Swiss-Prot record:
It comes from Sulfolobus acidocaldarius (strain ATCC 33909 / DSM 639 / JCM 8929 / NBRC 15157 / NCIMB 11770). InterPro entries: 2Fe-2S-bd, 2Fe-2S-bd_dom_sf, 2Fe-2S_ferredoxin-like_sf, 2Fe-2S_ferredoxin-type, Beta-grasp_dom_sf, Diverse_Oxidoreductases, Glyceraldehyde_DH_small. It comes from the Archaea. This is Glyceraldehyde dehydrogenase small chain. It is found in: Cytoplasm. Binds 2 [2Fe-2S] cluster per subunit. It catalyses: D-glyceraldehyde + A + H2O = (R)-glycerate + AH2 + H(+). Its cofactor is [2Fe-2S] cluster. One of its GO terms (cellular component) is cytoplasm. The keyword DNA-binding does not apply. Keywords: 2Fe-2S, Cytoplasm, Iron, Iron-sulfur, Metal-binding, Oxidoreductase. PANTHER family: OXIDOREDUCTASE WITH IRON-SULFUR SUBUNIT. [2Fe-2S] cluster 2 binds at residues 107, 110, 142, 144. Heterotrimer composed of a large chain (CutA), a medium chain (CutB) and a small chain (CutC).
Length: 163
């Protein structure tokens, strides 16, 4: 069991987007706050802070997680990918391209989480049906788009990733 004296931080060492970071934080620090405030990776958003909306979704040790549900201390030693880790050499990832080309965002607040969930989902389901897409992103809420173009974008992204 982790014992922390009053006023002491816990050491969190994580590899995020290929870079190792080591920080001392309060044991109550949420992973999403660690990512945004300690690492400055503000692409990951906080929508509800209660595991409902999915705006904070990142990949942790190969699985998508809602990072407002995980303590930073629980992520110690983990490999994490955030939205900033998807593009390379200033080139958008095919999923990001598909979201852009299918007008799958409006305000964009849900988009990083939606794309990270899509990234995970398409690894598990490289050639999904529309129904599987809808099921795969059901934990991510979008207040703007009505989901239609998001579903189209995920199906388009699956084609791009297969070609
Ligand atoms: S901010 Fe994490 S699920 Fe909404
Ligand atoms: S684009 Fe605005 S919440 Fe999804």
């Amino acid at each position: 069991m982790l014992v922390v004296k009053k006023g002491e931080g816990v050491k969190v060492r994580v590899r995020v987007n290929g870079v190792w970071y080591e920080k001392y934080v309060s044991p109550r620090t949420l992973l999403v706050d660690f990512i945004r405030d300690e690492l400055g990776l503000t692409g990951t958003k906080v929508g509800c802070d209660t595991t409902t909306c999915g705006a904070c979704t990142v990949i942790m040790n190969g699985k998508s997680v809602k990072s407002c549900t995980v303590l930073a201390a629980q992520a110690d030693g983990a490999e994490i990918t955030t939205i900033e880790g998807l593009s390379s050499d200033s080139k958008l990832h095919p999923i990001q391209e598909a979201f852009k080309d299918n007008f799958a965002l409006q305000c964009g607040f849900c988009t990083a989480g939606m794309i990270m969930q899509t990234y995970f989902f398409l690894k598990e389901h490289p050639n999904p049906t529309e129904e599987e897409v809808r099921d795969g992103i059901h934990g991510n809420i979008c207040r703007c788009t009505g989901y239609q173009n998001i579903v189209k974008a995920v199906l388009d992204a699956s084609k791009r990733l297969r070609s």
